[in-house]
């Protein structure tokens, strides 16, 4: 008993439907023929395993007449289809034809149909020449074709499949040689030939053909060896002698059949499902097959949705009225409850969520309290400073003190004096007298106020109104040392960015270098430089 025969055969036949859609759209007659013949043989083996499970009774005679001939045809059709496939792949990889025309496709289709279907029919008819009786019935295996084992039978039944397998291996070798010769530009070569093949499809086809051919050679050789071991080579005498008592049906019950014959029959039976699995393994797991599976699944799901009664999904939604969230969400609102609303009083007091940080959400106040630090906020800006003179608007530093201009100051020499810092009434945070950013030195004119550039003025000529200060700027980063500042001449921290001066750079004052040829690019109030500055275009008089 072999209870596994029927399910294995039927599953093998069903697995051929996986790569079928892609090959059907490609219109490859050779691969479609392989699928068709493997499907036929698997169905025959499965039906035989069901009918003759544990028995060898004579039944379904007409069915056996048909299936035995189809089995003979399948032994020829599979190597013929592999030969057609290898011929096509070798022609695609070669450079004998630049492009494939419609006439070439039509001739190829006719040739493949003749090789895959007409030639097996011819050999099915030729098998009648070496058919000694009607058929055999083996227990658990069903009906099998009967062959008069002789020299003509070897050349009719076994030699043609071996010859086609050898020719297929030659064409497959040439195809691989062409591929290796132009493997770097093979994809462009396939595109230039207007072929539907890609490099991956080409490799899968050629590898499948080679593996199938090797397997068919092994199968045919084993069948020939098994027949020679179990049957004696008989001489071909006459037609009448060979076909005498032709309507006889030979039965082989398991109890009287030699064990070697049963083992050989079991081995030959498993070769057909193995050939099917080899073919499916090469094409059922590629990108094309996966895309086809997705498309079929979408079609099935869309059909299932259309088959559902109208309003089925809405009824399911109404059934969720009493459904609540999982247990880790506390205080949740039941779904589908029409009485719930977005008002604060209808929401739960507190909801605990499964997060990494300890977060507590209070819905009544719409605030979130977490362990994270509070967001940074900028401090409020200081109140604007007020100036008593229009010249204060030219001050570079926003933290400069108030300035007043006096008419009693010697404007010809621009005497600059440094006075102690006077607290500003307009600044909210007056600078410290000891601050290093604003160096000061004592002055004889205590009523004078010094700005950031150490120009002095008296409050007599100050304007009666105040001018708001410009936006606050950061304090200067560099100030001169105390040793370089004298009461008679003070050095500004950096030159002002006045429009008349093209650029500003950090240099020593021109007073220290009177013969310097450099243009004066900063306001020099020294009397010795007054006439010198008028000569240079960058100077200021």
UniProtKB/Swiss-Prot annotation:
Top-rank lineage group of the source organism: Eukaryota
Keyword check for Aminoacyl-tRNA synthetase: no
Molecular function per GO: mating-type a-factor pheromone receptor activity
UniProtKB keywords: G-protein coupled receptor, Membrane, Pheromone response, Receptor, Transducer, Transmembrane, Transmembrane helix
Segments of this protein annotated with the region Disordered: 364-393, 414-541
Membrane topology value: Multi-pass membrane protein
Intrachain S-S bonds: none
Keyword Transmembrane helix attached: yes
Topological domain ranges for the Cytoplasmic compartment: 25-33, 91-109, 172-205, 286-541
Described purpose of this protein according to its UniProt entry: Receptor for the BBP1 pheromone, a prenylated mating factor.
Name of the protein described by the UniProt record: Pheromone B beta 1 receptor
Gene: BBR1
